[in-house]
Amino acid sequence: MADYGSDKKSRDNQMRSAINQQLVETGEREKLKELLRVRLAECGWRDQLKQLCKEIVRERGLEHVSVDDLVQDITPKARQLVPDTVKKELLQKIRNFLAQQANV
C-alpha cells in the first residue's frame, strides 16, 4: 500500500512538471503571472501585505526582522488573503489552456 501513495505522488509531480513545461513553452505562464499581478493589485491584496509587513517591523523592530523572517511570517497569511474570485479565475484559465492543448 505504501507504494501506491509514493507512485501517485511521483505521477502527480510528473504531471505538474509537464503542465508547467507547456505553460512556459507557450508563454502562457507569463500571461497568467501578469494577470495574477493585476488582479492582486486591483483587489488591494498588495496593500494589505505591505501593511502586514509594516506591522511586523513595528512590533519587532527593524533590527530584529530580516526579509526571510517577513516572507516566512507573511506567506501563509498572504495565501489566505488571495480572493476566491482570483483563484477561480486563474484556475479556469489553466483549465481552458489544458483543454486547448488536449485538442491540439
UniProtKB/Swiss-Prot annotation:
Molecular function in Gene Ontology: chromatin binding; transcription coactivator activity
Stretch list, region Disordered: 1-22
GO biological process: chromatin organization; poly(A)+ mRNA export from nucleus; positive regulation of DNA-templated transcription; protein transport; regulation of transcription by RNA polymerase II; transcription elongation by RNA polymerase II
Assigned keywords, A-Z: Activator, Chromatin regulator, mRNA transport, Nucleus, Protein transport, Transcription, Transcription regulation, Translocation, Transport
This protein's record includes keyword Nucleus: yes
Gene Ontology CC terms, in alphabetical order: DUBm complex; nuclear pore; nucleoplasm; SAGA complex; transcription export complex 2
Compositionally skewed regions (Basic and acidic residues) per UniProt: 1-14
Gene3D superfamilies registered for this protein in UniProt: 1.10.246.140
InterPro entries in alphabetical order: TF_ENY2 (IPR018783), TF_EnY2_sf (IPR038212)
UniProt-annotated location(s): Nucleus, Nucleoplasm
The UniProt record lists the keyword Protein biosynthesis: no
Chief location bin: nucleus
Family: Belongs to the ENY2 family.
Subunit structure and binding partners: Component of the nuclear pore complex (NPC)-associated TREX-2 complex (transcription and export complex 2). Component of the SAGA transcription coactivator-HAT complex. Within the SAGA complex, participates in a subcomplex of SAGA called the DUB module (deubiquitination module).
Function summary: Involved in mRNA export coupled transcription activation by association with both the TREX-2 and the SAGA complexes. The transcription regulatory histone acetylation (HAT) complex SAGA is a multiprotein complex that activates transcription by remodeling chromatin and mediating histone acetylation and deubiquitination. Within the SAGA complex, participates in a subcomplex that specifically deubiquitinates histones. The SAGA complex is recruited to specific gene promoters by activators, where it is required for transcription.
Protein name, per record: Transcription and mRNA export factor ENY2
The organism of origin for this protein: Ciona intestinalis
Lineage: Eukaryota, Metazoa, Chordata, Tunicata, Ascidiacea
